[in-house]
Amino acid sequence: MKKHRIFKRILIVFLCLAIVGVTSLFIINGYVKSSGKDRILTVEKAAELDDVDCIIVLGCQIKDDGSLSHMLRDRLMRGLEVYEAGAAPKLLMSGDHGREDYDEVGAMKNYAIENGVPSENVFMDHAGFSTYETVYRAKEIFEADKVIIVTQEYHLYRALYIAKQLGVDAYGVSSDLNTYAGQSMRDFREVLARCKDWVMCIFIPEPTYLGEAIPVSGNGDLTND
């Protein structure tokens, strides 16, 4: 009987902790989403902004043969649309190039050049391993204080929240040009990612790599391999 009471109390404690945890997830998720809603603009409205340093296109997975995924292609198409509208003079491609045989940013820059953007106007952040690291490095390495971030809308909320917490004046343009397979799972993972980056923005850890400044006002070819 005594063991039964102890088990019951333990179960109640775990249930209470679970309720608190789930409630916290939803509160933080809602807070992160709401903090950047008014900074998501159309291409036309983004082009009306003044003194934007660069357009940041956030990377995502490329295929085994190095070609672009549908999601990444849409980000690049929208990023180039914002660039061609005159919203900013430079593009910053940020993604994962942590291995010699996997290069998101190289594929992204090649796409921009193939579509008429001068190579010197396209910067690459080879160590943009996460959204948090991308925004941190945009400010500290590329000296970008005012930016337009391009990615799918579900991802924009978190990127804009991080930018706000790190002191970057950021606006977003959505690249939802299609529907994407597996989006329900991405939406679920994004809830957890928002909570993780909410914590990151409290402690402000340094990214995996820092280094010498490469001002985005200069020549993007300085970031070539």
Predicted regions and their residues:
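A structural signal for short, hydrophobic/glycine-enriched beta-strand patches
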Residues: I28-F188
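Enrichment for repetitive, rod-forming helical segments
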Residues: L15-C16, V82, F203
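Short, Lys/Arg-enriched, disordered terminal segments
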Residues: M1-I10, A87, G220-D225
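A transmembrane-helix-recognition feature enriched in membrane-embedded lipid enzymes
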Residues: D187-Y209
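Short linear elements at protein peripheries
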Residues: P207-D225
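N-terminal type II signal-anchor transmembrane helix
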Residues: K2-K45
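A general structural signal for short secondary-structure boundary/capping elements
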Residues: R99-E104, Y171, A193-M200, S217-L222
